[in-house]
């Protein structure tokens, strides 16, 4: 009994897929084709001079609209994806000068002698011991 019901269900499923592929998919593709024709301004009827609609012969959209689209996508994008409009490094500094200056100032503040990052001070003494391990409790 159970195997016959299972066979009936599988036959019903195959029949449903066949009907779907025969009737529904061609109508959807034809509907998409109609929509694309309407968006491009193509009409099936010919005008009096034997040519298609005048919008069909105008060509591709101008660069003005594509640039406007790109500008809109840049301005509406999340902050992470937006282009930076200003330089992070001032123009009068050379890149090597900037890197050397950055390394001298901030590295001594942020890292200890072992290369471990400092997170701040606790009670006037450093938060790390001589081996770079973080102190949590009493001082040594």
UniProtKB/Swiss-Prot annotation:
One of its GO terms (cellular component) is extracellular region. Residues 1-30 form the signal peptide. It is found in: Secreted. It comes from the Eukaryota. GO terms for biological process: neuropeptide signaling pathway. Keywords: Amidation, Cleavage on pair of basic residues, Neuropeptide, Secreted, Signal, Sulfation. InterPro entries: Gastrin/cholecystokinin_CS, Sulfakinin. The keyword NAD does not apply. The modification Phenylalanine amide is found at residues 119, 136. Residues 31-109, 139-140 form a propeptide. In brain, it is specifically expressed in four pairs of neurons. Not expressed in other cells of the brain and in the thoracico-abdominal ganglion. The modification Sulfotyrosine is found at residues 114, 131. PROSITE patterns: GASTRIN. Belongs to the gastrin/cholecystokinin family. Callisulfakinin I is a neuropeptide. The existence of Callisulfakinin II is uncertain. This is Callisulfakinin.
């Amino acid at each position: 009994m159970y195997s016959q019901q299972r066979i009936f269900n599988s036959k019903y499923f195959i029949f449903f897929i066949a009907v779907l592929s025969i009737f529904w998919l061609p109508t959807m593709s034809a509907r998409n084709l109609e929509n694309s024709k309407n968006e491009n301004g193509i009409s099936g009827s010919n005008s009096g001079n034997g040519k298609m609609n005048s919008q069909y012969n105008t060509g591709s959209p101008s660069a003005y609209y594509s640039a406007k689209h790109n500008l809109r996508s840049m301005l509406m994008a999340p902050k992470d994806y937006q282009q930076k409009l200003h330089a992070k490094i001032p123009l009068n500094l050379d890149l090597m000068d900037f890197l050397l200056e950055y390394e001298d100032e901030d590295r001594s503040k942020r890292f200890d002698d072992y290369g471990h990052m400092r997170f701040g001070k606790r009670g006037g003494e450093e938060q790390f011991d001589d081996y770079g391990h973080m102190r949590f409790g009493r001082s040594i």
